[in-house]
Amino acid sequence: MSLSAAEVNKIAWLARLAIDDDKVEAYARDLSQILGFVEQLGSVDTSRVAPMAHPLDEAQRLRPDDVTETDQRALFQAHAPLVEAGLYLVPKVIE
């Protein structure tokens, strides 16, 4: 697939990117090569390849989902400058 300079400019505009006019042709050439490679990948016969979610057959060992810390909300709020109804009060930043 070959991209024109106009198509590169349109893609850049849609992506809100600024491209120098002297680099548009180089981008068109590079993007065309990338798209050609993607087309080449799409033409590979993968009918005999087994689908997989992960290339390794190992499973990740996860720790048990146990509560390891106690509720320290009262302690933390005791150190806060301003607390009301269990909420931290902070100065207004935006008017």
Curated annotation (Swiss-Prot):
Gene Ontology biological process terms in this record: glutaminyl-tRNAGln biosynthesis via transamidation; regulation of translational fidelity; translation
PANTHER family according to UniProt: GLUTAMYL-TRNA(GLN) AMIDOTRANSFERASE SUBUNIT C, MITOCHONDRIAL
Name of the protein this chain belongs to: Aspartyl/glutamyl-tRNA(Asn/Gln) amidotransferase subunit C
Uppermost EC category: ligase
Gene3D superfamilies: Glu-tRNAGln amidotransferase C subunit, N-terminal domain
Transmembrane segments: none
Family, as annotated: Belongs to the GatC family.
Disulphide bridges, residue numbers: none
Swiss-Prot/TrEMBL catalytic activity: L-glutamyl-tRNA(Gln) + L-glutamine + ATP + H2O = L-glutaminyl-tRNA(Gln) + L-glutamate + ADP + phosphate + H(+); L-aspartyl-tRNA(Asn) + L-glutamine + ATP + H2O = L-asparaginyl-tRNA(Asn) + L-glutamate + ADP + phosphate + 2 H(+)
Protein's UniProt keywords contain Ligase: yes
Gene that produces this protein: gatC
Keyword match Ligase: yes
Keyword tags: ATP-binding, Ligase, Nucleotide-binding, Protein biosynthesis
GO MF entries: asparaginyl-tRNA synthase (glutamine-hydrolyzing) activity; ATP binding; glutaminyl-tRNA synthase (glutamine-hydrolyzing) activity
Function: Allows the formation of correctly charged Asn-tRNA(Asn) or Gln-tRNA(Gln) through the transamidation of misacylated Asp-tRNA(Asn) or Glu-tRNA(Gln) in organisms which lack either or both of asparaginyl-tRNA or glutaminyl-tRNA synthetases. The reaction takes place in the presence of glutamine and ATP through an activated phospho-Asp-tRNA(Asn) or phospho-Glu-tRNA(Gln).
The protein's assembly and partners: Heterotrimer of A, B and C subunits.
EC number: 6.3.5.-
